[in-house]
Each structure stands twice: as structure tokens, then as C-alpha cells.
């Protein structure tokens, strides 16, 4: 551009440096006419960054649609804000993360004392989390959270309105915030409604058949529940399969629901009621929180509101 130095052009387009308003407008107009786009790699180099952020999922997460949808949502948002997203493998040693040269990392469903979060804090790498870490003071930044207690309350109230009298929960141990909050919400709801809590323990990440032993004991007991809620993504499918083998009909004999929705729940027969945790939005908000942290903005994160998706598995036909 005639009469304007390369440095001034750079400052005008990047928003840095002192540039007169008129000059900035002329530079921006010229760039628009030329369809000029700044080189993000060069910009990151000037800022002393790589322009790459990491996304760490729990071990085995690739088997679950929730985490895949979250990763896709994060990737789309990263592209939109000029960042590259690297999906981190399950690292055998957390110290291996240093080799990636990441500007920051989003850790999804961190464990109670997550070694990756601890190592990132030691390295001085900015961290945000998908759900808070239960152990305080680990160095993690803001958390993108869902009010799982409130979401579960809405689901359990729906089961009660559908005729349930004894609602059991199929859940892993409370080793992360999602499960801990869900269990706490279930126990509080049971107290308010005068219902004895009934919990069957299953793995956090697994296939439907891995929950079937615990569910079989639950449904085959002398006082079986008339409604079961699965906390892990695939567990409600296991509940429905066991119920069928025991001669129980869903929803006439047993109401079945899930705390995590997936396409498999919509395609099951009958389709299974579930909480849509909106993983694509959660992924996008993780990137937003990390990008703000890298830009030196206040460490905040937008929450994600779950939605109850009612399907046939919890809608009993009218009697009489």
C-alpha cells in the first residue's frame, strides 16, 4: 500500500501498535479489496505461541458418542477462532504432554487427582476443564459445567409423574464431578420424596453388556425397582436388554432412562428417554474459555444447560 510501511500495515491489521484511525481504515479497506487474510502461523510466532491447543478425553472415550461430539464441537470452534486443535492420546506418562508444544489444554472429566492436570500446572500450561476437578488447588483454570443435580431432578420428577415408585441408579464410583454431582442429586431427590436410594455399580466407560451383571442382580431381587436410570452413556441399553431377558416389558413393567443421550438411545426399541448434555456446545465453550485465558481475559466459562428428551421408554400407556 503506497505511503504506508509494512510495520504500520501489520499493526493496523493485528490491532497492535499505535495507528491513526484513518490509516487503519485505509489499510483494512485495501486488505478487503485484495481478499487478504493474515497468516495465523506468523501471528502466533510473533506472540511466542504455536497456535495449537490440546483436548484430553478420558481413557476409552472414543467408544462413546458424547466425547466424539464434544471433540467435533471443539474442533469447529477452534477453527473459527484461528486455533489448531490436537486430540491428545491416552498418555502413559503425563510428562509426555510437554512434547506437543501446546499453548493450552482442555481436560474433559478430569479425575479426582488427575495426573495430567497436575503435570500441565507444573509446566505452566494454561488449563480449562470440562466439569470441575473435585480436588481443589490443582492449578486448573475455569470449568465448563452442567448442573447435573438439577438435570437429574427434572428426569426423576418425570419418572415419578409417569408412575415410578422405586427408582434405582446404575452408576460408576464418584471419581469425577459428573458422577459425584449426579449421585448427590439422586440421594437428595430420594430424601425429598421418601424413597430409599438403590445404586448398582458399573464401569464409567464400557459397553452395555458390562453393566448387565449388576443390573441382573438389581432387577432379579425380591424387591426390584420399577424404574432404572443409567449414568454412563451405554448403561441404559444394558438395563433394557436385561429387562427383556427377564420377561419385563419397557415401559409397562419398567421405566428406563439415561443421564447421557446418544443416537443409540433414539434408535433403540422402545426409544430411551435421556438427558441431552449438548456435547457439541460444551466442546465449543471449552475452546472459548481457553482462548480467553490465552488472551489474558478474565478466567470464566459459560455453563451448558442439559435438556430432557422424553421418549417411549418412560411413557406408560394409560390403564383401565
Predicted features by range, described:
Residues 1-51, 318-320:
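N-terminal helix-turn-helix DNA-binding module of bacterial transcription factors
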Residues 92-102, 211-223:
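Short, well-structured alpha-helical segments in soluble
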Residues 58-66, 89-93, 144-154, 170-214, ...:
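Hinge/beta->alpha junction and helix N-cap segments in small-molecule ligand-binding domains
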Residues 52-157:
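Alpha-helical recognition/docking segments in bacterial nutrient-uptake
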Residues 216-320:
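Flexible loop/turn connectors
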Residues 166-167, 197-199, 250-255:
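Short acidic capping loops at alpha-helix termini that bridge into adjacent secondary structure
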Amino acid at each position: 500500500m503506497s505511503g504506508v510501511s509494512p510495520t504500520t500495515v501489520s499493526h493496523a491489521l493485528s490491532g497492535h501498535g499505535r495507528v491513526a484511525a484513518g490509516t487503519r481504515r485505509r489499510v483494512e479497506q485495501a486488505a478487503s479489496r485484495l481478499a487478504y487474510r493474515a497468516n495465523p502461523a506468523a501471528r502466533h510466532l510473533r506472540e511466542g505461541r504455536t497456535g495449537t491447543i490440546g483436548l484430553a478425553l478420558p481413557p476409552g472415550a472414543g467408544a462413546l458418542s458424547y466425547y466424539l461430539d464434544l471433540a467435533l464441537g471443539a474442533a469447529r470452534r477452534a477453527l473459527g477462532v484461528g486455533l489448531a486443535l490436537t486430540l491428545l492420546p491416552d498418555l502413559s506418562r503425563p510428562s509426555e504432554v510437554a512434547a506437543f508444544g501446546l499453548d493450552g489444554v482442555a481436560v474433559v472429566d478430569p479425575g479426582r487427582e488427575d495426573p495430567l492436570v497436575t503435570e500441565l500446572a507444573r509446566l505452566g500450561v494454561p488449563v480449562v476443564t470440562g466439569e470441575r476437578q473435585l480436588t481443589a488447588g490443582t492449578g486448573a483454570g475455569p470449568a465448563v459445567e452442567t448442573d447435573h443435580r438439577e438435570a437429574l431432578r427434572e428426569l426423576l420428577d418425570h419418572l415419578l409423574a409417569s408412575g415410578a415408585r422405586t427408582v434405582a441408579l446404575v452408576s460408576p464410583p464418584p471419581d469425577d464431578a459428573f458422577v459425584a454431582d449426579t449421585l448427590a442429586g439422586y440421594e437428595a431427590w430420594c430424601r425429598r420424596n421418601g424413597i430409599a436410594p438403590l445404586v448398582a455399580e458399573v464401569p464409567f466407560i464400557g459397553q452395555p453388556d458390562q453393566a448387565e451383571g449388576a443390573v441382573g442382580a438389581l432387577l432379579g431381587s425380591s424387591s426390584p425397582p420399577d424404574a432404572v436410570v443409567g449414568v454412563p452413556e451405554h448403561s441404559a441399553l444394558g438395563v433394557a436388554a436385561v429387562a427383556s431377558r427377564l420377561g419385563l416389558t419397557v415401559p409397562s413393567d419398567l421405566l428406563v432412562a439415561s443421564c447421557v443421550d446418544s443416537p443409540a438411545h433414539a434408535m433403540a426399541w422402545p426409544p430411551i428417554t435421556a438427558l441431552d448434555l449438548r456435547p457439541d456446545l460444551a466442546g465449543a465453550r471449552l475452546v472459548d474459555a481457553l482462548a480467553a485465558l490465552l488472551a489474558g481475559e478474565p478466567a470464566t466459562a459459560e455453563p451448558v444447560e442439559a435438556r430432557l428428551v422424553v421418549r417411549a421408554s418412560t411413557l406408560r400407556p394409560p390403564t383401565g
